[in-house]
Amino acid sequence: MTTVQLQKTNQPPVKAPRGSYWITTFGCQMNKADSERMSGILEYMGYYPAEEELKADLVLYNTCTIRDSAEQKVYSYLGRQAIRKRSLPNLKIVVAGCLAQQEGESLLRRVPEIDLLMGPQHCNRLESLLNQVDSGQQVLATEEQFILEDITTPRRDSSFCGWVNIIYGCNERCTYCVVPSVRGKEQSRTPEAIKSEVEDLAKSGYKEITLLGQNIDAYGRDFQSQNKEASAQITLSYLLKYIHDIEGIERIRFATSHPRYFTKELIDTCSELPKVCEHFHIPFQSGSNKILKNMGRGYTIESYKNIINYIKSKIPKAAISGDAIVAFPGESETDYEQTLSLIDEIKFDHVNTAAYSPRPNTPAATWPRQLNEDIKVKRLREINSLVENIAKERNQRYKNTSQEILIENINPKDSFQLMGRTRTNRLTFFPRSLENGVENKLGELIKVKITDVRPFSLTAKLL
């Protein structure tokens, strides 16, 4: 599980300075987008980025509970801040996100030094909740509520690629997953609000946006309770068309998709819209229909293959990535081999893999036939080896080809290189300047020629 820290900004505070802040983000892209929003609120309130975590006047941990390892890391960080608070009583400790929602009062009892504990549905209430903290209260905010439309401009972690939440929550009931219980029911933002945010990004010079949702292709389903006619019309396909022609935006991505809602209409739309990038992340989780049924995923391997085959027929150069869980309770050797076979058959460009981790208050955590750690380690090692080999094989198709790259950053391991991604989401490294000394700038779209490939990245030269 990675930890992502937001970078500093030079924007002045909107209100009188109140002190420095530090945000550490654990987990998924949704959390990263939430952290950007909360950072924007903090800076509106008068907070400014700290030089480092241990010098901050306010620390905020935006947490993840998808696996136990992420939880344990949060507890370690909290322990360090609790010690700080003994000598710095004015230090504010904020815990947000899925772990906060899941643990609630028990987390406050475990770490009483926490000033504010809030679930992911409360990100936009951060200012009012911190005002309660300033009045001397210890605040717990985990009750379910309607998502407030965005009230403060996020402080983006990138100046070129922007996250845009379009749907919050999840209505699925996968037997291994805590997300529905911690992120609440699906709530779609209106197309008008989304378009307005994307237009603001375009005016600020952003070239690429990634639309985000726990099940992004379920966008618009919840509108049915308000207006059945509107629900039938407002889908992810509709939204992509609605925002596609915004001037300045050159690339559109979306994640994460659920196979149940990935329709032919959506694939057709993506094939017709030139700004939609040719990369689709569609988790499959297992290659065994038995395991998929036990997981409560709501589709079969056959229906999943139909989706992938249709994508390949309509968008032949598309890159496909997915997620897989190994060692789910009751997973036999045959079930596991079916997962390996599926990966080998589809030839995924990348697969995010994980060994099953029992999560509190999920059905699968209490089932018999839990697999031991030795099996988990063995299967995870084997599947990762297969994924890496196929990824390198797939990347061979890029060698000696010209690719469009959006320059995102300087290579942190080599200051003479820049880095960016192809439209198919391949991370690519290339020199900072042409032979004549002209240097490319961050945020530019350029053409490069791929000279070397590795399993998960490419090397290129400038054209």
Curated annotation (Swiss-Prot):
Source organism superkingdom: Bacteria
Catalyzed reactions: N(6)-dimethylallyladenosine(37) in tRNA + (sulfur carrier)-SH + AH2 + 2 S-adenosyl-L-methionine = 2-methylsulfanyl-N(6)-dimethylallyladenosine(37) in tRNA + (sulfur carrier)-H + 5'-deoxyadenosine + L-methionine + A + S-adenosyl-L-homocysteine + 2 H(+)
Domain Radical SAM core residues, every copy: 156-393
Domain MTTase N-terminal as annotated: residue spans: 19-135
Primary residence: cytoplasm
Keywords: 4Fe-4S, Cytoplasm, Iron, Iron-sulfur, Metal-binding, S-adenosyl-L-methionine, Transferase, tRNA processing
Cofactor annotation comment: Binds 2 [4Fe-4S] clusters. One cluster is coordinated with 3 cysteines and an exchangeable S-adenosyl-L-methionine.
Cell compartment(s), UniProt: Cytoplasm
Gene Ontology CC annotation, any one: cytoplasm
InterPro entries assigned to the protein according to its UniProt record, in alphabetical order: Elp3/MiaA/NifB-like_rSAM (IPR006638), Methylthiotransferase (IPR005839), Methylthiotransferase_CS (IPR020612), Methylthiotransferase_N (IPR013848), Methylthiotransferase_N_sf (IPR038135), MiaB_methiolase (IPR006463), rSAM (IPR007197), rSAM_horseshoe (IPR023404)
Keyword Transmembrane helix: no
Binding-site residues for [4Fe-4S] cluster 1, renumbered to this chain: 28, 64, 98
Biological-process GO terms, alphabetical: tRNA methylthiolation
Disulfide cysteine pairs (residue numbers): none
Cofactor(s), names only, from the UniProt record: [4Fe-4S] cluster
Binding-site residues for [4Fe-4S] cluster 2, renumbered to this chain: 170, 174, 177
Summary of the function given for this chain in its UniProt record: Catalyzes the methylthiolation of N6-(dimethylallyl)adenosine (i(6)A), leading to the formation of 2-methylthio-N6-(dimethylallyl)adenosine (ms(2)i(6)A) at position 37 in tRNAs that read codons beginning with uridine.
Family: Belongs to the methylthiotransferase family. MiaB subfamily.
Name by which UniProt lists this protein: tRNA-2-methylthio-N(6)-dimethylallyladenosine synthase
Organism: Prochlorococcus marinus (strain NATL1A)
